[in-house]
Amino acid sequence: MTDATSGSDPDSTTPVDLTGEDFRDPDALRRRAGVSGDPNFDQHFLIDDRVLDRIPTYLLDSTDTTHILEIGAGTGALTDRLLAVGDTVTVIERDATLAAFLREEFAVMIDDGRLNIIEGDALEVTLPAFTTCISNLPYGISSEILFELLPADCPLIVMVQREFGERMAADPGTDAYGRLSVSAQHYATVEVVETVPPTAFAPEPAVDSALIRAEPRDPDYTVTDETFFLRFVKAVFTQRRKTVRNAIRNTAHISMLDTPDAVVNAADEALLSQRAGDLTPSEFAELATIAAEKGK
């Protein structure tokens, strides 16, 4: 769980080197596609060549790039870079016009079997098997998509709203730490590797963006019922200003506990006296295990 570094040095994390590669110009791609973007549909095209070139360099040396998944390919500016580092790339694009453009623009790569185009909404189509996902995600559905991707146990490098990314990576005891932090860090070690200004996009979004890297991890705890664990975390954080003791009692209707008092009686006082924002994912897992055994 590492905090943001604006424009951090990619060479410190990976040997990926795109020097000398001749990539398609993002502005030229937009002109050929005949699109300008639509903020009402979360359509902001990443047009800064420097940012686009850096994105693949945040891959760790150990990352398997056999099959890269990209969600929201747009005009293909990032797709072009991903084809330089991946054996096969599959993109999901919901805009029919853009999907048709991608099939024409990258026809050679498609014919060579290196690029697959899936036309549809990423939340509705069946996600293909992949070894890593690198995407500029539609911000309005970032959370839903990420919690489809994180359980796949594959590395992710994704662009999200800066505030959202910082919440994912936040440490216990900080203002940004919350349900999103615990849930994301249950699956992965999350790091904000770069912050990106609105000027890197066209049209410009109203907020800063952030690139996050999520590396799958094996938790130092065991959760027997993952669905209940995530629901319990959600419930307790709805009363983050209360002590955990009171939060468990007051949110039994959310966590679906029948006997919350039994949970409180069985739990460690050192945990019950804290607030949700101070508990680590491991401590939440300890409480959730007790809740599942004593409260249901």
From Swiss-Prot:
Residues 1-25 are annotated as: Disordered. It is found in: Cytoplasm. S-adenosyl-L-methionine binds at residues 44, 46, 72, 93, 121, 136. InterPro entries: KsgA/Erm, rRNA_Ade_diMease-like_C, rRNA_Ade_Mease_Trfase_CS, rRNA_Ade_methylase_Trfase_N, rRNA_adenine_dimethylase, SAM-dependent_MTases_sf. One of its GO terms (molecular function) is rRNA (adenine-N6,N6-)-dimethyltransferase activity. SUPFAM superfamilies: S-adenosyl-L-methionine-dependent methyltransferases (SSF53335). One of its GO terms (cellular component) is cytoplasm. Its EC number is 2.1.1.-. Residues 1-16 have a biased composition (Polar residues). Keywords: Cytoplasm, Methyltransferase, RNA-binding, rRNA processing, S-adenosyl-L-methionine, Transferase. Signal peptide: none annotated. PROSITE patterns: RRNA_A_DIMETH, SAM_RNA_A_N6_MT. NCBIfam families: ksgA, PRK14896.1-1. Belongs to the class I-like SAM-binding methyltransferase superfamily. rRNA adenine N(6)-methyltransferase family. RsmA subfamily. Specifically dimethylates two adjacent adenosines in the loop of a conserved hairpin near the 3'-end of 16S rRNA in the 30S particle. May play a critical role in biogenesis of 30S subunits. This is Probable ribosomal RNA small subunit methyltransferase A. It comes from Haloquadratum walsbyi (strain DSM 16790 / HBSQ001).
